[in-house]
Amino acid sequence: DRSPSRGLGDVYKRQVMMGGALTVPGNVSPWAEANVNQDPEATDAIFRRLKDITMIGLDVTLQTLLTVDETAKWEALGTPGGDFLAAATNYYIDAYKTTAPHLGGCGLHDPLAVGVAIDPSLVETIAINLKVDTEGETRGRTIGDETRLNDEEKTAKVAVGVDKQRFLAEFMRRLTDLAAAAK
C-alpha cells in the first residue's frame, strides 16, 4: 500500500540517501553538503522520523572517483555511447578541477548511493542518531544528535568507509557494457 497517508518508513524497511558530511567538510560551506543544504529542515525531519536510514555522504563519495583514465576506456570503445559518457564525464571532471583540484577526478555521489542500496556491504558504517543544524552559521550540518546520544536504538548509519575498488570495478563494468552496446 503506497497511500499518501503512509510515510517512507512505513513503506520501505531501509532507506539510503546521498547527502551530508559527518567526518569531512561540506561542499557548499565548511559544514554543509549541497543536497542537505537545499532543505535542512526536511533532512532533519527524515533523520528524526525514519528508523533505518543509511547516509552516503561526502565521507565516502569523494573516495570513489572517476578520472580521465576511466573516460579514456569509454572513448576507446569507438561507439556513440562511449563517446557520450566520456565527454559528459570529462566535463564533470573539469568542473572538479576548479572546485576540488586536489581530488584528481569527479566524485560518484549518486551512483555510490544506488550501489549501497543494492549492496550494503560496499560500505562500512557507524550507527548514530543524526540531526541537521537548521539555524545559524552551521545551517545544513549533519551531526550526531546530542539529545539522543545515549539512546540504545540508533536510527541511522553513516558510511565512513567504502570498498572503492569493488564499487568502481562494478560501476565501470556496467557502464562500459552499456556504452559498448550503444551504437
Predicted regions and their residues:
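Single conserved hydrophobic/aromatic residue that forms the stacking wall/gate
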Residues: 1-8, 12
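Aspartyl protease active-site motif detector
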Residues: 6, 46, 114
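Short, well-ordered, mixed-charge alpha-helical segments that flank or form enzyme active sites
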Residues: 6, 22-28, 62-66
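Short, glycine/charged-enriched secondary-structure capping and boundary segments
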Residues: 9-10, 30-32, 69-71
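Short coil/turn connectors at secondary-structure junctions
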Residues: 10-14, 50-51, 126-128
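Active-site glycine-rich loop that binds ribose-phosphate moieties when present
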Residues: 14-48
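Short, conserved beta-strand edge motifs with alternating hydrophobic and charged residues
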Residues: 17-18, 54-58
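Conformational coupling and interaction surfaces
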Residues: 37-41, 56-183
